Regions:
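Extended substrate-binding grooves/exosites of carbohydrate-active enzymes
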Residues: 1-166
């Protein structure tokens, strides 16, 4: 099988060449709401029922030092990247993905925060903070435990989210 990962508009000619197609989608981070992924996927499936649809990238930035009581998105190109928004974002996106059997796969962007010299956002310049674990690999963010609870049925645990919000 051949596959393509795309950030191009839906229905672009490149989408018709490969057996499988996946799109980078950041609804709820770079515009829109976290619930928009479900609407987009349903629309693509309706318009192009023969497409084998995947999500090649999805994620939202988060700093373990940015805590808030309210559930409001951060500014993707700014410094405020609240951890609770990242968790909400992943919960909404995973719900949309897991409820749609026509989505063949999805890929979280990213397991770890990573260096990105051109970035000046989040709590430190030069870091992409969309990871589920901090750059130094020492702290697992709340969204990490959301996926662990959904994907690992053997390791029973209780995790209290928003525990850093004091």
């Amino acid at each position: 099988l051949t596959t393509s990962a795309s950030f191009l508009e839906d229905g672009n000619e490149i989408s018709k060449i490969t057996d499988l197609i996946a799109w980078n989608k950041y609804y709820g981070w770079y515009g829109g709401s976290a619930a928009d992924l479900a609407k987009w996927a349903d629309q693509i499936h309706r318009n192009y029922p023969s497409y084998k649809l995947g999500i090649s990238e999805y994620g939202a930035g988060a700093s373990i030092y940015h805590q808030q009581d309210s559930l409001k998105p951060g500014d993707p190109s700014g410094w405020w990247h609240p951890e609770n928004w990242q968790t909400h974002y992943h919960m909404e996106n995973w719900k949309a993905i897991s409820e749609r059997p026509f989505i063949w796969g999805s890929f979280i962007w990213n397991l770890f925060d990573f260096g990105a010299a051109h970035r000046t956002e989040g709590d430190r310049p030069g870091i992409n903070d969309k990871g589920l674990v901090t750059f130094d690999r020492k702290v697992k963010k709340d969204a990490f435990y959301f996926y662990k609870a959904n994907w690992n049925k053997k390791d029973k645990f209780i995790y209290i989210a928003n525990r850093r919000c004091v």
